[in-house]
Amino acid sequence: MRWPPWSSESTNDEQKQTPSSWLSSAANKPSSILDWTAFTELRTIIPTVVLTSGILIAVRFHRRYLRRIPDAPSISSSYLRRRSIFGQVTSVGDGDNFRIFHTPGGRMAGWGWLPWKKVPTVKKDLKDKTIHIRLAGVDAPELAHFGRPEQPFARDAHTWLTSYLSNRRVRALVHRQDQYSRVVASVFVRRAFDFPPFRRRDVSYEMLKRGLATVYEAKIGSEFGGDKMEKKYRKAEWWAKKRARGLWKDYRRVGSGWESPREYKNRMGMGDPLPIEKGNGKGNGKGKIGQK
């Protein structure tokens, strides 16, 4: 029986045959299913290239600028004398060395305000997660270590460095690594209450000006970050010495028994540490670096 009544019998037959006809047509034309021409069209190629390039650039950018470095031995040779490390000071161990927690990208990358990018404050949470830094170009008086007596003005240098850097964000231009799992670096800090405020300060230079350290002297050489910086440091030391500031107070007094941090180390048998060469970074013409 035809339905609807006014339809012709031929139309009804066509409707009955439509599903089977469609299947047979699909079977007879497999090329329509595996048609690759769509993948060669510009409207497909251009978005694919843009998306792939964007992913690769993002991965490279993250690896180069946003990947956190946990400790000094993990620093790649590509950083030495070429790049700097930004981080927050977590502790000050001596008058010329301290530890920072690497915060790549700083606040712009979310450090300090995103919940998952907080600098740990508990000591156990910082274990194996900080970079040990030795200030370049200076030698501060030694605190009491391993049964050795404390050198005069060692406590003053340590107290000043702690108050100047503790919990502050600093930028360290990495020069070399040493055998104590540290990096020798020129360190810079900006402070709101300095004059002028937020001016970039060279920490080594500030210590020399105040007579809290001497220019680093060693038989195998020292690291200053270039000849220009060495001249600047030596001039700052000369002025502090002339004005008898800090550890230079008794320098000219006869019978005071004054000795420099280097002379103290030599007397205590604390030889120069061996440097660890990493990569092919060129030095400053002063020999290998081994600051202690």
UniProtKB/Swiss-Prot annotation:
Active site as annotated: R134, E142, R182
Enzyme class per UniProt: hydrolase
Disordered: annotated span: 1-27, 257-292
Membrane-spanning residues: 45-61
UniProt binding sites for Ca(2+): D139
EC number(s) given by UniProt: 3.1.-.-
Compositional bias ranges of the Gly residues kind: 281-292
Record's keyword annotation contains Transmembrane: yes
Compartments in which it is found: Mitochondrion; Membrane
Chief location of this protein within or outside the cell: mitochondrion
Chain ranges of the TNase-like domain: 83-250
GO cellular component, one term: mitochondrion
Topological category with respect to the lipid bilayer: Single-pass membrane protein
Stored Gene3D superfamilies: 2.40.50.90
Ranges of biased composition (kind: Polar residues): 17-27
Molecular-function annotations in GO: endonuclease activity; metal ion binding
Superkingdom of source: Eukaryota
Keywords noted in UniProt: Calcium, Endonuclease, Hydrolase, Membrane, Metal-binding, Mitochondrion, Nuclease, Transmembrane, Transmembrane helix
InterPro entries reported for this sequence: SNase_OB-fold_sf, Staphylococal_nuclease_OB-fold
Family: Belongs to the LCL3 family.
Protein name, UniProt field: Probable endonuclease lcl3
Organism for this UniProt entry: Penicillium rubens (strain ATCC 28089 / DSM 1075 / NRRL 1951 / Wisconsin 54-1255) (Penicillium chrysogenum)
Lineage: Eukaryota, Fungi, Dikarya, Ascomycota, Pezizomycotina
